[in-house]
Amino acid sequence: MVLIRVIANLLILQVSYAQKSSELVIGGDECDINEHPFLAFMYYSPRYFCGMTLINQEWVLTAAHCNRRFMRIHLGKHAGSVANYDEVVRYPKEKFICPNKKKNVITDKDIMLIRLDRPVKNSEHIAPLSLPSNPPSVGSVCRIMGWGAITTSEDTYPDVPHCANINLFNNTVCREAYNGLPAKTLCAGVLQGGIDTCGGDSGGPLICNGQFQGILSWGSDPCAEPRKPAFYTKVFDYLPWIQSIIAGNKTATCP
């Protein structure tokens, strides 16, 4: 079964807190507080959240399937139970989803660009992540991160974001896993399983060799299954659309 990695659970400040252990992201570690100044998360009701990535002082990227009418965007956050002095909340001023996206196919062109209602300032815990200058290479070591479930049963959620390293696979592995591979998509994971993104990590970044290469879209259910990588929207393939929208061409179509 395929899982779109949005969750419908308790508010992040109310979820069961997982003590630091070997079961994080799934299978990673607590992120260093200085590792993720670009990482944001959003509430779009009292019960749902997704990850996001700050790409400049006024714009964030996430998955299109995370879109809801009301969204509250948190930046500069680390521990849900402790406030950083520089954390801020923003709301969408404008939201852009590919106009040529297939309406009934959630995984098609699963990317959304959001303009914040007010720019943010760079600070100790807030700074953008640059868009990629080159596409990623198969075999690259990639970093995943988020506040999503840290157990495959999706009954434990963390107070802090967790990080893990996974590998970028070739298209053969991806097609074997799911009998196909959507266009402009990357797949990444660990062949033996045990390390993966999970529910609540949707929309968060895939960072390969230091570059923002993917946006988490979907994966296996349960998470972290052997030979069942997760799928990420390939950011590099959408650069012309992203740059056109930011430049003011609001009717730009996706490739």
UniProtKB/Swiss-Prot annotation:
Any GO CC annotation of this UniProt entry: secretory granule
Family annotation (SMART domains): Tryp_SPc
Localization per Swiss-Prot or TrEMBL: Secreted
Propiece residues: 19-24
Enzyme class: hydrolase
Tissue distribution of the protein: Expressed by the venom gland.
EC number, UniProt record: 3.4.21.74
Residue pairs linked by disulfide bridges in the UniProt entry: C31-C163, C50-C66, C98-C254, C142-C208, C174-C187, C198-C223
Active site per the UniProt annotation: H65, D110, S202
Matching PROSITE patterns: TRYPSIN_DOM, TRYPSIN_HIS, TRYPSIN_SER
InterPro entries, alphabetized: Peptidase_S1_PA, Peptidase_S1_PA_chymotrypsin, Peptidase_S1A, Trypsin_dom, TRYPSIN_HIS, TRYPSIN_SER
Keywords, sorted A to Z: Blood coagulation cascade activating toxin, Disulfide bond, Glycoprotein, Hemostasis impairing toxin, Hydrolase, Pharmaceutical, Protease, Secreted, Serine protease, Signal, Toxin, Zymogen
Signal peptide from the UniProt entry: 1-18
Reactions it catalyzes: Selective cleavage of Arg-|-Xaa bond in fibrinogen, to form fibrin, and release fibrinopeptide A. The specificity of further degradation of fibrinogen varies with species origin of the enzyme
Biotechnology and industry use: Is used for the investigation of the last phase of blood coagulation. Due to its heparin insensitivity it can detect fibrinogen polymerization disorders even in the presence of heparin.
Sugar-bearing residue positions: N170, N249
Keyword presence, Magnesium: no
One term of GO molecular function: serine-type endopeptidase activity
Similarity section: Belongs to the peptidase S1 family. Snake venom subfamily.
Known partners and oligomeric status: Monomer.
Miscellaneous note of the record: Negative results: does not cleave beta-chains of fibrinogen (FGB).
The protein's name: Thrombin-like enzyme batroxobin
